[in-house]
Amino acid sequence: MSATLEDSPRLASTEVAVKLDGVRKVYGRGDRAVTALDGLDLRVAPGEFVCLLGASGCGKSTLLNLVAGLDKPSAGSIELNTSRPAVMFQEAALMPWLTAARNVELPLRLAGFGRADRRAKAAELLELVRLGGVGAKRPHELSGGMRQRVALARALAATLRVDGADAPALLLMDEPFAALDAITRDVMQGELLRIYRSTGTAVLFVTHDVREAVRLGQRVVLLSSRPGKVVREWAGSPGVEDAELTDEITARLREVISSHAAG
């Protein structure tokens, strides 16, 4: 099967924001080849919050890179019906010489927005993440949680289009809160849910934390150990601390890890 990944979003279905069919990703060749993903199928609906869980090395980050267009699948197809995906990583990766507002403006500038529009939209997004008063500050003047809020505002800015077209937005998040302390992480999870509900952005969120996945996801998807493929899905209730569901998913994750170790 040949690999296909469109340079510009292609209509898959009015009810599908992201569609992956039989996706395979192999690094290297011959005896040194490593298969990160194999036969992975996944759907994300417009405005849906999907959490990806799995053991280290199962291909979660690889999957995000493929959806973002940062890499190409070795086989299978990936179809998007969204604006260009925005990516948020564990590190905020803000430009240290730019203010918070200018960091948020950067993707808008690259997208062709005029100066006045950039400033207005950056101010609006900083207000959305509750940082309306820090636009003039540089990253070193902000706490870790505040820097991640700025990074979130910048990611949301990256989903905007200068032509004003109302394409569904897609946010790809690779363990964005993993480096934060427990209290700040809890606050950021709540803030992300608030922003998600107010914007209707589809989210594909990678995490190792089962509790985080259950709290955030409308759907929790478990990947097998490498090579990664979907082995189980659960429906979630965002904002709800469901101890029973957390225990069930944790037990299944342990089974996946144990079976891989035994093999």
Predicted regions and their residues:
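A short, flexible loop at the N-terminus of ABC-type nucleotide-binding domains that lies
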Residues: 10-20, 26-39
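Conserved ABC ATPase "signature" region
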Residues: 23, 109, 116-134, 194
